Amino acid sequence: GPTSGPDALNNPNSAELLPNDNVLIADENNNRAIEITRDSNIVWQYNDTGLQTVAFASRLPDNNTLIVDSGHSRILEINMQNDVVFQFFTNSTSKSNPSPLPSNAARLANGETIIADQINERVIIIDSKGNTVFQYGRTNLAGVGPNELNWPYTAFVIGDYTGQTPPPPKFEPTSVMLSGG
């Protein structure tokens, strides 16, 4: 593809191969999520002027797209008509860092969403209403001891098929996997 201009990527931070053989890309510094064909034609994009630093994008089973708008500390779910159908701000509690730069989110099989909330030093799982149902790490307090994290970058539940790794047969998800930056 091109190396400069409107069709060039600027720090693509994630890429997901879709069932239709297209690729969904979080084009971080162009502030957009795009779906491209194998010959680099853009067939869908979300580039609302309100986006700032798109860190991650993932297509959901219902064809909506989960987007991490890191610069605005939010997780968005966008339908194919580019309507926001859900959003969650990771800087909305009193102890939150004002700019926590969430870096990754994945929709779990049970409908909840796991979020690596990088500078808030935590991984959270939220339900469909935005309620936190699980948290590991102390909000905005880095560390290396029990219940402490230092800039978690990625998180997913082992055995929960989120498009990253299919679970083994008859596996019950019981553990949370974390990786730091």
Regions of interest found by a model, annotated:
Residues 1-181:
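Histidine-/acidic-rich catalytic cores in large beta-rich domains
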